[in-house]
Amino acid sequence: MTNLRKTHPLMKIINHSFIDLPAPSNISAWWNFGSLLGVCLGLQIVTGLFLAMHYTSDTMTAFSSVTHICRDVNYGWLIRYLHANGASMFFMCLFMHVGRGLYYGSYTFLETWNIGILLLFTVMATAFMGYVLPWGQMSFWGATVITNLLSAIPYIGINLVEWIWGGFSVDKATLTRFFAFHFILPFMVTALVMVHLLFLHETGSNNPSGISSDTDKIPFHPYFTIKDILGLAILMLFLMTLVLFMADLLGDPDNYTPANPPKTPPHIKPEWYFLFAYAILRSIPNKLGGVLALMLSILILAIIPMLHTSKQRSMSFRPLSQCLFWMLVANLLTLTWIGGQPVQHPFIIIGQTASILYFLNILILMPLTNIIENKMIKW
């Protein structure tokens, strides 16, 4: 009898995607993050659904409904902190997944890479809107500051901001629509993930060597399912340690104060995973220039395939490029630190220097280094 998983129309799709999928035999632990992101997305949708059952998207009751979830709902505190810290884990995995793509040259799969960038933008938008929902001080002022950046767009900026707000300030209409979008966007992310996987399975996975692995493939199950379960166990250990011992470590104390429009917090800052982009935004004194730099800091990923001048795909055998890659990582960590600091000396100059180095590294230093390495191969 023919195996059901190979003949049933639905099971066949799952089989080709997760069971009999031919995978390169040499892919390392850096290839775990795709499946971990899938787990994070599932966790966020499930915990978010349970939170939505008790949350009210009204400015008068939003803050107290979150308090009610934490105090009165059975395991409400656990669901809330799993959701909040799950977002942090999601972004940690996202950054490592993108970093892996940069290091091993996975961006040469253009469709997969571009869908990935679209996914990154969508997840960032979802996270931003989710941060507004508890309606604490940082929620309100974060929403005000970030949405107000759109007013820098010539001609239509102010009208666009008022249209997003649903009035002349961040208020009830803003909160209601942010909740609606925050609920629907994860399902759009899920659809995009399916397209991302569809394009990936057209070409097959990349591998650390960067060369074709068609001659040496092994089935995804059991080899990589077991490997991914180890990654999942480590992720859950980190997440549960955060949730059960340091639930508020990555949050902001100001968000435990209900939103108060007349009173501005001393330092307005977003969640930690947006701080690198926020630091780039703040490093430019001009408002429109800052907004453009903010957008370019993510959009720059889309032009990386065009900047690839090396004859080798992966950085595994390119030590100079490896140095620049780890400089870029250090740079992003510096920007993340600066984004959380007040706007004063010496943080201003450090932020400006790190921002210049970020763009300089990707746009000029990396392509030049690739050309030098090509010449070194001939020597």
Curated annotation (Swiss-Prot):
Heme b b566 binds at H97, H196. Its main location: mitochondrion. It is found in: Mitochondrion inner membrane. CDD domains: cytochrome_b_C, Cytochrome_b_N. It comes from the Eukaryota. GO terms for cellular component: mitochondrial inner membrane; respiratory chain complex III. Belongs to the cytochrome b family. This is Cytochrome b. It comes from Cephalopachus bancanus.
